A protein has these predicted regions:
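Cysteine-centric segments in proteins
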Residues: 1-82
Length: 82
C-alpha cells in the first residue's frame, strides 16, 4: 500500500518501502503522470535519505522533504499525512 502525504507546497506524494529492510523506497509525485521513482537509501546525518540521483526524499519524525537533486529545486517540505 502507498502512503499518501501532502506537502506545504500542496504537492502530493505517494511512497512505500519495497522491502522489510527499508533500504529502498518507491515514490511518485501525483502531478508527474504517476512516474515511480525507485530511491535507494544513502547516508544521512539525521533521519533517512533516499535518492535515485534525480529525486531526493528525506524522512525525519514522520515528515518528509522532496526535491530535485540536480537543481536543488524544492518540491515540498513538511510533507506528511493530512
Amino acid at each position: 500500500d502507498w502512503t499518501r502525504w501532502t506537502c506545504d507546497s500542496k504537492a502530493v506524494i505517494e511512497w512505500r518501502y519495497i522491502d522489510g529492510s527499508k533500504n529502498i523506497v518507491d515514490l511518485r509525485l501525483k502531478d508527474e503522470d504517476d512516474v515511480v521513482h525507485h530511491l535507494e537509501q544513502e547516508p544521512a546525518a539525521v533521519g533517512a535519505f533516499y535518492s535515485d540521483g534525480r529525486l531526493g526524499f528525506h524522512l525525519e519524525n514522520d515528515e518528509g522533504l522532496v526535491y530535485w537533486v540536480e537543481t536543488d529545486d524544492l518540491i515540498g517540505r513538511g510533507c506528511k499525512a493530512r
